[in-house]
């Protein structure tokens, strides 16, 4: 995280080679993650076209989602987005900047208009855990068209990381309980990246 801003981008050819090698090993699902993967949306769509036997997924802040991208996503049919959101407008903008929540909602509306599958990604910390797992928030995300959800606990990384944002032991226990309730009662496929490790016999990343 301390290296954000440095230009360490993989070329399209390298990305394509990684996927080709992965397929030889039986891997057909690929995730793109931060900074902001959609700064490479042209290359991602190109990869989707070239590897129709694979499915691609990206975490995004939604600011680069436009109608053209939505049309391309619908055409390739093997690319989905999870929008980073941390609860209601107040708690989302608290850590991600003023106006971020509204931009995410606008991107969700655009995706729904184009009848695309999408979800949300929530980083839970000391000041938003109860908000981001509340019925009010989850139901709102479902109504906006989300079909899946990723939950990540805040981990302080980098030179100026805030340790005061770490979720408490009680909040992590609450998340374990609530994620199972959400899966049982909501039309939403929800995953807690940390607490659900038991289902993958270890790290969910693979």
Language-model segments: residues:
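A short acidic, helix-capping loop that chelates divalent metal ions and anchors anionic groups
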Residues: 2-5, 89-95, 157-163
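Radical SAM/AdoMet-radical enzyme domain recognition
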Residues: 12-32, 40-153
